[in-house]
Amino acid sequence: MMKRQLHRMRQLAHTGSSGRTPETAEFLGEDLLQVEQRLEPAKRAAHNVHKRLQACLQGQSGADMDKRVKKLPLMALSTTMAESFKELDPDSSMGKALEMTCAIQNQLARILAEFEMTLERDVLQPLSRLSEEELPAILKHKKSLQKLVSDWNTLKSRLSQAAKNSGSNQGLGGASGSHTHTTTANKVEMLKEEEEELKKKVEQCKDEYLADLYHFSTKEDSYANYFIHLLEIQADYHRKSLTSLDTALAELRDNHSQADHSPLTTAAPFSRVYGVSLRTHLQDLGRDIALPIEACVLLLLSEGMQEEGLFRLAAGASVLKRLKQTMASDPHSLEEFCSDPHAVAGALKSYLRELPEPLMTSDLYDDWMRAASLKEPGARLEALHDVCSRLPQENFNNLRYLMKFLALLAEEQDVNKMTPSNIAIVLGPNLLWPPEKEGDQAQLDAASVSSIQVVGVVEALIQNADTLFPGDINFNVSGIFPGLAPQEKVSSQQVSEELPPVTVPAPATTPAPTPAPASMAVRERTEADLPKPTSPKVSRNPTETAASAEDMTRKTKRPAPARPTMPPPQPSSTRSSPPAPSLPPGSVSPGTPQALPRRLVGTSLRAPTMPPPLPPVPPQPARRQSRRLPASPVISNMPAQVDQGVATEDRGGPEAVGGHPPPPALPPQPRPRGLISETE
């Protein structure tokens, strides 16, 4: 038993890496040996491909069409779209697009189900039979043949050994020798019979194995067709899917373009406005002036010319992004941004900065720098004119348009604080920049110096816009923004001519007929210089005059008290207020204030707003006399001579109502606080 196992191990060791075995190699030719070596790799390849391809299936394996479609993710997506479509307006653009997409996903799901069923039938099942049935059967026959050959070789070894033993026993004499010889001969006969039977089995198994090898070699091409058919099925699946998608996309785009009533929505997408070259943008839209330049200029001409710090102050990022999107999708809705000129200016700067090539062109960068380096103004202006003439036509038109606008903006520098120098500092780096070159720090320093020269170039263009770009310009070139820039704001000369001269009205020489009391110092002086009109309702006594003066100083309007029916007593009374020391007529200095009596009636004097320099009169006598003054109704028809007589007695001078007013340098004496409160 141990010898048999050891012999088997030797056979396995002699097999080698090529897969050849001594048991089968002696029965096979060179061609069949190569076929035999391809059996194991073919079996492993078919098994692995079948396993991974089975994992690629999205539907239920082995199910019919309807069950398979329900399990597909595309069908689940189509169902979700159908449920979402019910909540949308079927006439809206989004509703129509979602409905069409839902139908396409359903169609793609059915195409995928058909593809998977075909794949299972024509590829997966043959690979499964090849890896699980056909090749294992051939390998099983090979293994059986190896075992039979091994057993046959072992039996032949035993038979040879038995024959040797039988020959050695034949030379022994005696009864025991003949018995041993007979036993050995019988054993040899039995081994010969077994060897004959085993040889027949080996021949039979060898024939079957050779037949399998021939069959495999003839069907090897058909096995390769499995993989070719896999690619054909996939190509057919993708072709059907692409056809369905192309048909649906064409129909969907037609419907969407018909539903869109704005021609610029599809003609000017965001990618065709910002970040593209100027020539491409103008050719695609059929324009002479870039859309962002014209729209932003018209918006600023409409509202933002006097905005302080225009182009210098940054706008909000969200507002700027929304403005740029509106610019690209619906330029007719830009009027809502008129109230934010900084956002409009930011959109213009963003467009100039995002151009692939600067508006003043990189090819002429050195020429611009040479023109800026000239010191003599005339030579510099001539050099700038020469460089402008060599610009491409589309660049020249847009630069002329922009410089004309910036010149108008600089005319408002007293209000917006944007001088040509400030405008050039802000916009210069967006109009011209040096070509991109990789270099050291010295080149970076040179670039920073060139940016200063760029500012000088742009400043000179703004200051000499009328010389370098002669003639007026119509800023509303395309005519699609009639509401942004009125026709009177189109050219620079029209803007300046529209400002009417400001006329200052001359002051009135005659007073208003209204007899209402004045509350301002200027009006008081005017009324003091004019004759005092007779009030149709009331005539004030001296006490009321002083009270009204106090009211004017407090900025408070109070009702006047009733006028007494009896004339005031003579100033010589012991209870009257002591008069101020009188001077002879004509001896009063005009610069010296004079105290006036309290009960001056009929005069046109008004109390000043500032207190007089003289001290107040003791209030006691006046308070006792004021209690004796009875209140009476207003008498509008009292003769003016009464007031005139009282004034004459108190004052000692001929002061009448219609007479000339006293000198303004003689203010009346202020009224005591106690008398004012009692009178009120």
Swiss-Prot record:
Domain Rho-GAP: 276-469
Positions of the UniProt region annotated as Interaction with CGNL1: 1-275
Residues modified to Phosphothreonine: 592
SUPFAM superfamilies given in the database record: BAR/IMD domain-like (SSF103657), GTPase activation domain, GAP (SSF48350)
Compositional bias ranges of the Basic residues kind: 1-11
Composition bias type Pro residues, residue spans: 502-516, 561-571, 609-621, 660-671
Key words, A-Z: Cell junction, Cell projection, Cytoplasm, GTPase activation, Nucleus, Phagocytosis, Phosphoprotein, SH3-binding, Tight junction
Composition skew (Polar residues), residue ranges: 160-169, 536-546
Start and end residues of each stretch annotated as Interaction with CD2AP: 470-680
Residues the record lists as Phosphoserine modifications: 241, 262, 535, 582, 632
BAR domain segment(s): 81-262
Keyword field contains Oxidoreductase: no
Function according to Swiss-Prot or TrEMBL: GTPase activating protein (GAP) which specifically converts GTP-bound Rho-type GTPases including RAC1 and CDC42 in their inactive GDP-bound form. By specifically inactivating RAC1 at the leading edge of migrating cells, it regulates the spatiotemporal organization of cell protrusions which is important for proper cell migration. Also negatively regulates CDC42 in the process of actin remodeling and the formation of epithelial cell junctions. Through its GAP activity toward RAC1 and/or CDC42 plays a specific role in phagocytosis of large particles.
The name this protein goes by in its record: SH3 domain-binding protein 1
